[in-house]
Amino acid sequence: MSDNLRSRIVTQGSQRTPNRAMLRAVGFGDNDFIKPIVGVANGYSTITPCNMGLNDLALRAEAGLKSAGAMPQMFGTITISDGISMGTEGMKYSLVSREVIADSIETACNGQSMDGVIAIGGCDKNMPGAMIAIARMNIPAIFVYGGTIKPGHYQGEDLTVVSAFEAVGKYSAGKIDDNELLAIERNACPGAGSCGGMFTANTMSSAFEAMGMSLPYSSTMAAEDAEKADSTEQSAFVLVEAIRKQILPSQILTRKAFENAIAVIMAVGGSTNAVLHLLAIANTMGVELTIDDFETIRKKVPVLCDLKPSGRYVTVNLHQAGGIPQVMKMLLNHGLLHGDALTISGQTIAEVLQDIPDEPPANQDVIRPWNNPVYPEGHLAILKGNLAAEGAVAKISGVKKPKMTGPARVFESEEACLDAILAGKISAGDVVIVRYEGPKGGPGMREMLAPTSAIIGAGLGDSVGLITDGRFSGGTYGLVVGHVAPEAFVGGTIALVNEGDSVTIDAEKRLLQLNVSDEELATRRAHWTPPKPRYQRGILGKYAKLVSSSSLGAVTDVELF
């Protein structure tokens, strides 16, 4: 059977003479029209260090595809730099870009009848955007992560971009001077690669490796190391074989694969954004997955890796300690992974992990032994209560007190909140509420890294809570609760909180509660009026109109008709 199952529609027969004529102009020869055409979705961009090394990887992917007997066709996808847009109106486009990336890959691959695709991405939304497209198309596909940045260094300490965000809070609190602030800025990001802790990009790449959609070890490699380029070329060979065997995403992205991904995310201390993105991918793939599934798995899986933002190490250290395969082998041995789940190579998870040691190396403490975890349970807790009937996500790693009750400090935007923190107007015991930053209300669920980093930098990380219908960066830690649903814009209870109201965050009881009577809430709800959309044209206007609740993954194609 021919391997060009889809592309033959544009390459075979006399009627396709004009099609072949154009393909000859881009490098096809007489013998190439029976080969599978494989897309190379290249996220290269000089917008961000996360993506600036991707073109070299795309060229290696092209070379690998040609050597394996396929015809590559490269096309570009966009990216937004979360780190650069953070704290600005531009961050509203970040989650939107996930949908644009998905739409663009789907459009290019289906429009050109490609037989498969190798997607190469770096910054946060590149990963879920690509995987949503892969799930929509259900053609053989593999994801290549651009790799992590190496840590910066200053005064004997490893730095990440989060160090720079926290330095702003320290500077505002008078803890560091101009010279130290500038030194941290100059040293935080030393080269190419995605943000170096177990932030969102590294979390999602780890999840994809756990799901079998990326090659072993590839999710923790440094962007600038030769092994990353070698792994990319190997990914091309694996993909062509998957095309020949017709190994499809629907065979890999099963319920078992999602449960494996959640277990790994808990074990490595991953980002809250993984909840949103995995829900979106599952929704697209038609896999039943709810926000409650994260809580079920959280209770079973310990945090095994001592990684930033709340821990000591960065992702290259995890790679040196055995990477995601080592973590997965430990989970498999304790019955917390589905070993029979399929991977893109055609092997099962158990077969991939067969030769991995049962325990991590003794001469490191990045990956902790099973009997001495960083935390006995997972760190991403799903909270519910009258403030979040559909659920909210709390990241409780690095938190000394997982519960608090305090007066609400209410802000209608991230900017207003940050100004108050930097002006010293937030005190220990306060519960900060940032609302109208949800999928529809923002729109786009901006990440609150600037406010949370300012809180940490001011020394209030253990004594101030923050609740939002927006999101958090993977670099955030502290007593923070995001993804509150229903969001304020659609009349969720978070819209009804008044300044000074008593609010409870209790991660132990998984409770998020506004401590006012039902009668008072009913009165406030009766007087609440929906705000006008902030944008009524352009992509933000379209997004706000189409996007679903964060509890469903904030996807834009649910119940379109």
Curated annotation (Swiss-Prot):
Listed EC numbers: 4.2.1.9
Cofactor annotation: [2Fe-2S] cluster; Mg(2+)
Binding locations of Mg(2+): 82, 124-125, 447
Gene3D superfamilies, alphabetized: IlvD/EDD C-terminal domain-like
Positions of post-translational N6-carboxylysine modification: 125
Annotated cofactor note: Binds 1 [2Fe-2S] cluster per subunit. This cluster acts as a Lewis acid cofactor.
A GO term, aspect molecular function: dihydroxy-acid dehydratase activity
Recorded catalytic activity of this chain's protein: (2R)-2,3-dihydroxy-3-methylbutanoate = 3-methyl-2-oxobutanoate + H2O; (2R,3R)-2,3-dihydroxy-3-methylpentanoate = (S)-3-methyl-2-oxopentanoate + H2O
Superkingdom, taxonomy of origin: Bacteria
Chain ranges passing through the membrane: none
InterPro entries: DHAD_IlvD/Edd, Dihydro-acid_dehy_C, DihydroxyA_deHydtase, DiOHA_6PGluconate_deHydtase_CS, ILV_EDD_C, ILV_EDD_N, IlvD/EDD_N
Keywords: 2Fe-2S, Amino-acid biosynthesis, Branched-chain amino acid biosynthesis, Iron, Iron-sulfur, Lyase, Magnesium, Metal-binding
Subunit-level organization: Homodimer.
Record family assignment: Belongs to the IlvD/Edd family.
Role summary: Functions in the biosynthesis of branched-chain amino acids. Catalyzes the dehydration of (2R,3R)-2,3-dihydroxy-3-methylpentanoate (2,3-dihydroxy-3-methylvalerate) into 2-oxo-3-methylpentanoate (2-oxo-3-methylvalerate) and of (2R)-2,3-dihydroxy-3-methylbutanoate (2,3-dihydroxyisovalerate) into 2-oxo-3-methylbutanoate (2-oxoisovalerate), the penultimate precursor to L-isoleucine and L-valine, respectively.
Protein name per UniProt: Dihydroxy-acid dehydratase
